[in-house]
């Protein structure tokens, strides 16, 4: 039996705990907050899945059939809690404890082959056979500094909560990723003058086709983007 450290109790962390336990390993998971679910706890109010519940759920634990096709953030948080309870994952999680330092143990072999030393915010140092990092990639916000050009309000998607943050503003959304598109739609639905800029061209299409999620229609991939636009 090997002993592993998992950093973070968001969706990836929870799935990793179960997978490692199923493989017969001993697990310690450290979560710096007091809740599971990661960024789903504090992201913008309009956050929802962009893939359908049928293809997004954890293996062996489908989402309830009566839920919306593209569940809202609140549904997802409930789902994570149900998943953790169903497989008794919480007892492997230490909350309010951050991992502050990770380094490989000394060895003449490949890095990490002798194990890893992990120090947590409670000052305890532990050793593990491996470390799985599941702390997410949305915590650090990158806002470019362009002095002397724009003096208006700047809001990063990681800080945006709802339309109250930009009420009455003329809105420019930079980027066409998932968050960018969500926020552009949020602003437009509030009747704000909304524009979106992107590095390269994109094809924006409905999430459903005749009531079916596009991700479930394999035959759609046989068509070009232009043909898909016409069909949609």
Residue ranges with predicted function:
Residues 6-12, 16-36, 124-126, 131-232:
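Rossmann-like dinucleotide-binding core of oxidoreductases
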Residues 62, 100, 106, 159-162, ...:
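Residue-level detector of flexible, active-site-proximal loop/helix-junction positions
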Residues 69-139:
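Feature captures the FAD/FMN-dependent oxidoreductase FAD-binding
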Residues 6-90, 198-207:
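Beta1-alpha1 glycine-rich phosphate/pyrophosphate-binding loop at the start
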Residues 46-62, 110-114, 148, 229-232:
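Flavin (FAD/FMN) cofactor-binding and adjacent substrate-gating region
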Residues 57, 95, 101, 154-157, ...:
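Structural signal for conserved beta-strand scaffold positions within catalytic alpha/beta enzyme cores
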Residues 1-4:
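Extreme N-terminal starter segment of soluble prokaryotic enzymes
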Residues 43-45, 108-109, 209-213:
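Short low-complexity, flexible loop/linker segments enriched in glycine and/or proline
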């Amino acid at each position: 039996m090997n002993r592993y450290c998992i950093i973070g109790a968001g969706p990836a962390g929870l799935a990793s705990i179960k997978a490692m336990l199923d493989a017969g390993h001993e697990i310690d998971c450290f979560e710096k907050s007091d809740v599971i679910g990661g960024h789903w706890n504090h992201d913008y109010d309009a956050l929802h899945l962009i893939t359908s519940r049928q293809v997004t759920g954890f293996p062996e634990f489908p989402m309830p059939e009566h839920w919306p096709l593209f569940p809202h953030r609140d549904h997802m948080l409930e789902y994570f809690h149900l998943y953790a309870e169903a497989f008794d994952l919480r007892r492997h999680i230490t909350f309010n404890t951050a991992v502050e330092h990770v380094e490989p143990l000394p060895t003449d072999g490949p890095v990490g082959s002798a194990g890893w030393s992990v120090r947590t915010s409670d000052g305890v140092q532990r050793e593990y056979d491996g470390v799985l990092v599941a702390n997410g990639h949305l915590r650090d916000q990158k806002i470019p500094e362009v002095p002397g050009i724009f003096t208006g309000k700047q809001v990063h998607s990681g800080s945006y909560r709802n339309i109250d943050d930009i009420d009455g503003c003329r809105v420019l959304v930079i980027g066409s990723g998932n968050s960018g598109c969500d926020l552009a739609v949020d602003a437009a639905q509030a009747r704000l003058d909304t524009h979106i800029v992107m590095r390269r061209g994109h094809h924006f299409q409905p999430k459903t086709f005749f009531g079916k999620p596009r991700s479930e229609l394999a035959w759609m991939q046989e068509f070009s983007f232009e043909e898909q636009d016409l069909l949609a």
